């Protein structure tokens, strides 16, 4: 009952606290990449659940760009499967990209009108497409009902069909003894003699302290670096785990540019999850590219308020002109990319002089695209235009955008080049760990949520194994 079918009301799920954003290409922060609820951003994500292309885990060695991960594709494949089983991913019998794999736990979702446009355009262009693997139920699971295709996925699922962390990992953790302290803000990690001793957090109007033998930071790519930097003290004057100055650096997003158009037939693109059909053609094809990396693109289905905001912002429409444009809503179609962005040291999270309501310095985010990122962007726009035109779309226009967050506390094999090791254990403080998307050394050309959850499964196993061996 906390998830109303009301776009404006559900903006409470987004992290909209003040943040300073700048650089050559400032990124938007909030609903497109940050959540503030039990379950985090998975409560409002659109459930796209894709594995990395295996070569991306060794992109420097095999593809000539980026940096190699400290974990292998072979090891991650096992944890991808574990995450897919927990989330009951619904996908096609034969997903056409990547190594051979077993079937998804649930059957694929039916195609809506927007997905049929992508499929039609891709087929006419000779490009392979598939239904998108999604973390929402296509058949009953336990007490949860399957998706009823209301289209409110991005503002919280009121039926529990969406398999967010709120209804999967968290209940399991609570059943095994975890305690959730919601409506709390962690401000600082305390250290003594080179080790973390606990966290200071604000709850119910006052600051409190929780002692801990181990601290795991999982605030995502802005709040985790912010927490480590705000925890600077006499022992660690530049921030925790930041002796090499890399905390907050190598922040990444995904290009999330769109091409929109209209068609004669009635599409009603809001019926169903937003991204029902996908092509990863340009993730797995390296020929004919003038850029490193890759991208996928998916069909779209924005709700009315979001669509009105999109049109008003991207096209400058207002008043009667906007009202007339909105009458075309059921005939609109669109494609959006998830495009890889190179890791750059200049893209970073720092702390600003301004403070929030808790007296904590707020984050300052700087971002700029590389020349390679811009070439990928131009290539993807042309590809999407061609597919929509092949499907019979007209009056095409484009929209800039970014989505997702990755990096900021990158994992690696060498202490000089990373914040943590392959297990998320910080090099400088042995009982301080990071377990979120900030660990990712590269972003790939797919949504990061499945990779983040697979990494968390792996880190959990490693902590358990080390504990059993007495190494903690």
Annotate each PLM feature.
Residues 18-33, 41, 45, 69-73, ...:
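FAD cofactor-binding and catalytic pocket of flavoenzymes
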Residues 43-64:
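Periplasmic solute-binding protein
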Residues 131-138, 142, 146-155, 160, ...:
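A glycine-rich dinucleotide-binding beta-alpha-beta segment and adjacent secondary-structure elements
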Residues 442-463:
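A conserved FAD-binding loop/helix module that cradles the flavin
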Residues 30, 208, 219-220, 243, ...:
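Secondary-structure capping and boundary motifs in well-ordered enzyme cores
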Residues 10, 22-25, 60-186, 405, ...:
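Conserved redox-cofactor binding core of oxidoreductases
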Residues 1-18, 35-48:
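Conserved N-terminal glycine-rich FAD pyrophosphate-binding loop of Rossmann-like flavoproteins
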Residues 1-2, 159, 175, 184, ...:
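Glycine-rich loop(s) and the adjacent beta-strand/alpha-helix scaffold that form part
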């Amino acid at each position: 009952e906390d998830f109303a079918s009301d776009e404006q009301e559900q903006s409470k799920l987004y992290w909209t606290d003040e943040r300073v954003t700048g650089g050559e290409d400032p990124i938007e922060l909030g609903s497109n990449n940050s959540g503030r609820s039990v379950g985090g951003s998975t409560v409002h994500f659109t459930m796209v659940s894709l594995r990395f292309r295996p070569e991306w885990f060794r992109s420097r060695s095999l593809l000539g760009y980026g940096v190699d991960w400290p974990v292998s594709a072979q090891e991650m494949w096992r944890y991808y499967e574990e995450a897919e089983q927990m989330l009951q991913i619904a996908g096609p019998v034969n997903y056409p990209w990547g190594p051979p794999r077993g079937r998804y736990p649930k059957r694929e979702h039916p195609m809506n009108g927007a997905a049929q446009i992508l499929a039609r355009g891709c087929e006419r262009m000779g490009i392979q497409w598939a239904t998108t693997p999604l973390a929402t139920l296509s058949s009953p699971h336990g007490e949860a009902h399957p998706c009823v295709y209301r289209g409110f996925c991005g503002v919280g699922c009121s039926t529990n069909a969406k398999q967010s962390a709120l209804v999967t990992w968290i209940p399991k953790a609570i059943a095994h003894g975890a305690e959730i302290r919601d409506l709390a803000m962690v401000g600082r990690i305390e250290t003594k003699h080179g080790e973390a001793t606990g966290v200071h957090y604000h709850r119910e109007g006052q600051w409190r302290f929780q002692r801990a033998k181990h601290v795991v930071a999982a605030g995502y790519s802005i709040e985790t670096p912010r927490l480590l930097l705000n925890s600077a003290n006499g022992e660690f004057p530049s921030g925790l785990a930041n002796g090499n100055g890399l905390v907050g650096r190598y922040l990444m997003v995904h290009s999330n540019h769109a091409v929109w158009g209209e068609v004669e037939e009635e599409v009603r693109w809001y019926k169903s999850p937003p991204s029902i059909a996908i092509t990863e053609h340009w993730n797995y094809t390296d020929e004919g590219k003038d850029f490193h990396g890759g991208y996928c693109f998916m069909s779209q289905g924005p709700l009315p308020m979001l669509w009105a905001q999109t049109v008003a912002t991207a096209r400058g429409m207002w008043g009667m002109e906007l009202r007339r444009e909105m009458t075309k809503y059921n005939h609109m179609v669109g494609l959006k990319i998830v495009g890889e962005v190179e890791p750059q040291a200049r893209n970073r999270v720092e702390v600003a002089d301004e403070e929030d309501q808790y007296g904590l310095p707020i984050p300052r985010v700087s971002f700029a695209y590389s020349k390679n990122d811009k070439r990928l962007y131009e290539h993807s726009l042309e590809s999407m235009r061609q597919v929509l035109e092949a499907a019979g779309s007209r009056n095409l226009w484009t929209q800039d955008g970014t989505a997702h967050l990755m990096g900021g506390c990158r994992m690696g094999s060498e202490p000089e080049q990373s914040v943590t090791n392959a297990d998320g254990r910080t090099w400088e403080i042995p009982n301080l760990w990071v377990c979120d998307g900030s660990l990712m050394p590269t972003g790939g050309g797919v949504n990061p949520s499945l990779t983040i959850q697979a990494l968390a499964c792996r880190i959990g196993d490693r902590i358990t194994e080390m504990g059993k061996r007495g190494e903690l």
